[in-house]
């Protein structure tokens, strides 16, 4: 991969994904932005747009990724559970959040999303090396 700057929008919708011909121009996925620079891949938000990004990344034998959450509303995290690189033990995925709302850590937020009755499996199904980190914005 060249070490230039590349930005790709995988999802730009707010609140809820949508489908249909009328959404073809901008797409129907919720928030997900990929930035590659200096040989690194940074992903901002994990809305439904992260699923097709994950399918593309799954073609690589090993990936090293940082995902930053602008905030943890459902439309910014819901695609994380379908992100294929999380299910490959050769991958490293670091999750970062600076705008948590409430007392939960980022790991607790994702764990809460991935539990009954909302989801059939827990975050322990992730096979990649996954790190959860919070930081103070400003």
Language-model region placement:
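Binuclear metal-dependent hydrolase catalytic cores
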Residues: 1-138
